[in-house]
């Protein structure tokens, strides 16, 4: 890989991955907003070479923010690693780790998910005070006072105005 790098040839992570590392992939939601009513992983777990299959039932329930600011982040702590509610197409549903990419791909196809599809908020112009809440949960929080209110679909709000320049 070093020679390829210095000669300007493309190098991919798979080119430098240790031979004994696991392949990890994520099953993602096909829905913009839905509840996971049932998720069956038993057939995926039986695939040769599969080491681990995780769903919302298996991961810690500790919220975090995905916004990427420094601490204390003004963006809301509104995400779990995996949860039983998906909020966008591509939201993670399950994580599979295995010895080969072929095994992981096969396991992903064997995970069976039953969704209750919900109305989605697809336009930020109509999101505020929409009856469809993106984050209806009670353990949602914002570390900084930026006007966040999950019961109004607000991750932040502000006020703009002019003061009295003569006083």
Predicted regions and their residues:
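Flexible, low-hydrophobicity surface segments
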Residues: 1-147, 151-154, 165
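Accessory "access/gating" subregions that flank catalytic or transport cores
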Residues: 159-165
């Amino acid at each position: 890989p070093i020679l390829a790098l210095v000669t300007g040839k493309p190098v991919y992570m798979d080119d430098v991955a240790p031979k004994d590392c696991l392949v990890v992939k994520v099953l993602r939601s096909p829905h913009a907003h839905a509840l996971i009513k049932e998720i069956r992983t038993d057939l995926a777990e039986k695939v040769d070479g599969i080491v681990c299959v995780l769903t919302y039932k298996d991961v810690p329930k500790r919220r975090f923010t995905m916004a990427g600011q420094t601490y204390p982040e003004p963006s809301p702590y509104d995400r779990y690693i995996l949860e039983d509610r998906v909020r966008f197409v591509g939201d993670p549903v399950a994580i599979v780790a295995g010895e080969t990419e072929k095994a992981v791909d096969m396991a992903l196809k064997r995970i069976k998910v039953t969704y209750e599809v919900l109305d989605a908020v697809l336009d930020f112009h109509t999101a505020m005070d929409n009856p469809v809440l993106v984050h209806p949960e009670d353990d949602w929080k914002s570390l900084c006072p930026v006007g966040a209110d999950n019961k109004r679909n607000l991750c932040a709000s502000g006020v703009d105005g002019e003061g009295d320049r003569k006083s």
